A protein has these predicted regions:
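N-terminal membrane-anchoring alpha-helices
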Residues: 1-40
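Residue-level preference for short coil/turn positions at secondary-structure junctions
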Residues: 41-42, 72, 102, 148, ...
């Protein structure tokens, strides 16, 4: 009998820790060395966000937005899963993206949760474009500073790379270079991509 209380306490602590750590905003800083980076891009900061799903990070995303402002990014990239596949109300997330766009030019790539429902994905793409967010869906865009530019690419992968028809995630195919080339085209190797 005496072992049940410590076991329960340990399980409760571990469960609470996992819940909290999964909901905390985490900031990682990396410095990248890019050989063909044009001089006007040296020292520029990119803020990468991803997998927001149902998280809010404060009322109206205020903690998230304040962290983004504090980072002083030159560009914001959102790498998919702005919402979860079962969410239907896009208004709060669109308001967040508008706020991010006012911090720095913002670029968006769809994740697997967005592409689970292509009607929602198309509506989201239209609304994001209307508010000035750049959408990367199997295309390249140039980011320019002065006379310098870099090329950025974004894919919208088919669902077969995210899950099987039975919604399982085992033995998923790896995307191959020729498939990426088919989606994005061949990069200009003389430029910064």
């Amino acid at each position: 009998m005496s072992y049940k209380l410590p076991l329960f306490a340990a399980a409760a602590f571990l469960g609470g820790y996992m819940l909290i750590s999964n909901r905390q905003l985490r900031v990682n800083k990396y410095e990248l060395k890019v050989s063909k980076l044009p001089k006007n891009f040296v020292g520029k900061k990119i803020l990468l966000l991803a997998d927001l799903h149902k998280k809010r990070y404060g009322d109206n995303f205020n903690n998230l937005v304040n962290s983004c402002i504090a980072a002083e990014p030159d560009f914001i990239f959102f790498a998919g899963d702005l919402y979860s596949r079962d969410e239907t109300d896009m208004i709060p997330k669109l308001a967040l993206m508008k706020r991010l766009k006012h911090i720095a030019p913002t670029y968006y790539i769809f994740g697997n949760h967005e592409t689970d429902n292509m009607d929602n994905a198309e509506a989201l793409a239209l609304k994001l474009t209307e508010c000035g967010v750049h959408i990367l869906r199997n295309n390249m865009e140039q980011i320019k500073i002065g006379e310098d530019h870099i090329n950025i690419y974004g894919t919208q992968l088919p669902q077969r790379f995210y899950r099987n028809e039975d919604f399982s995630h085992h033995d998923l195919p790896q995307i191959k270079k020729d498939e990426l080339t088919k989606l994005l085209g061949e990069p200009d190797r003389s430029e910064c991509n």
